[in-house]
Amino acid sequence: MARICVALDVPWERAIKIVKDLYDFFETYPLILKIGHKIYLEKGGDAVKELKEDFPYEVFLDLKLHDIPSVVGLAVEKISELGTDYTTVHLLGGPEMVKEAVKNKGSMKILGVTILTSHDENYIKFLKSNFEDIKNFTLYLARVGIENGVDGVVCSGEEVEFLKKNIEKDFIAVVPGIRIKKEKRHDQKRVLTPAEAKKRGADVIVIGREITESKNPVYVVERALKMMGEI
């Protein structure tokens, strides 16, 4: 089963209204609630605590940590103490940073960020990387994460099938950049529909603005679930 993760990159009051509406309609479906810098800077760790207290959903604190290993380790420890279910670290931070994150995760799951979906092949040129394409660079980063203990990776839907075929260990594949209407790309360059992402092997499908900017978030989630064959 592929799960929908709702990216709540909106003010806190709006986020709570959306979650309440979704809960009223999808009480038994295991949604994941993702909060990022916007809400975290507004509410701090209380955002995680309140969501966990008021709703039966897993909470994903997406801060994309990237710093020296000791700093990331301390941050991960504090994030875990909030009751967070998932958090992210940038795999570009390297093996030692990843190991320190994993060592301090407690019962939380660590997700390694590969290449953001706002990047395309031009990013490889910008980095002056020896990799010929973004797909193989993503595979390299994913292996760095999985070999050092992450529970899953965040990658584009264009790479998820390639990763699943070329990495022997089981891992959670989290795919952002999902659009029900692919023409609504916003600042994403590599996008798929929910059905396409599931077919290619995504375990968690992240949908943000199509839900949070909709007048009817419930309809958007319901439509995505139908496209995925989950209801």
From Swiss-Prot:
One term of GO molecular function: orotidine-5'-phosphate decarboxylase activity
Segment forming the signal sequence: none
Enzyme class at the top of the EC tree: lyase
Pfam families cross-referenced by the UniProt entry: OMPdecase (PF00215)
Metabolic or biological pathway: Pyrimidine metabolism; UMP biosynthesis via de novo pathway; UMP from orotate: step 2/2
InterPro entries tied to this protein: Aldolase_TIM (IPR013785), OMPdecase (IPR014732), OMPdecase_bac (IPR047596), OMPdeCOase_dom (IPR001754), RibuloseP-bd_barrel (IPR011060)
Keyword Protein biosynthesis in annotation: no
Binding site for substrate: 9, 34, 62-71, 117, 179, 188, 208-209
SUPFAM superfamilies: Ribulose-phoshate binding barrel (SSF51366)
SMART domains registered for this protein in UniProt: OMPdecase
Domain of life: Bacteria
EC number: 4.1.1.23
GO cellular component: cytosol
GO biological process: 'de novo' pyrimidine nucleobase biosynthetic process; 'de novo' UMP biosynthetic process
Reactions that this protein is recorded to catalyse: orotidine 5'-phosphate + H(+) = UMP + CO2
Record-annotated active site: 64 (proton donor)
Gene3D superfamilies: Aldolase class I (3.20.20.70)
Sorted UniProt keywords: Decarboxylase, Lyase, Pyrimidine biosynthesis
Similarity-based family: Belongs to the OMP decarboxylase family. Type 1 subfamily.
Subunit structure: Homodimer.
Function: Catalyzes the decarboxylation of orotidine 5'-monophosphate (OMP) to uridine 5'-monophosphate (UMP).
HAMAP family: OMPdecase_type1_B (MF_01200_B)
PANTHER family named in the record: OROTIDINE 5'-PHOSPHATE DECARBOXYLASE
Protein's recorded name: Orotidine 5'-phosphate decarboxylase
Species: Aquifex aeolicus (strain VF5)
Organism lineage string: Bacteria, Pseudomonadati, Aquificota, Aquificia, Aquificales
